[in-house]
Amino acid sequence: YRLVGGVNFYQRQEIKDILAYLKTIDSGRDDLSVTRIVNVPKRGIGQVTLNKLAVYASEHGMRLFQAMEQAEQIPGIGKAADKIKGFVNQIMVFRALAKELDAAELIESILEQTGYLEELEKLEEDKAQAKQENLDEFQNKAADYYANHDEAALTDFLEEVALVADIDNMDSEAD
């Protein structure tokens, strides 16, 4: 466990982004994760649209991701429905991949297929490199987990990460 620049590893933006993708792929039940990644990288889905989705989800007793799956039926969503559908379809593709790949391979697919890596390349070189190193480290943690746990599923890996992140938070609060 290492503290880099005073920020807990699991509190780093790029790690939180990829964790949010993994949680959304795993179940889609975490509305915060869905909200975090719907525009990472940018997809042009605005706050007004997200608010309409959230209201629809609330009124119909469903999760945000479930509302997104029905976006074209929601009044006032308009052209944004296509962008939302693109996001939903991408998550569905990742869900299918998650059945065949371990988390490290899935992370690689997310980074490449979403354009996340391309976005990183637009940053200042040292910032981009630091973020890439953190993502590599996270992939290594995922690979290690799967190497040490036969029959591990994405849910198991996410539970492990949550546990480690909680312990890291307690450690950093104790300092």
Spans of model-derived segments:
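Short, acidic/turn-prone active-site loops that include or flank metal/cofactor-
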Residues: 5-9
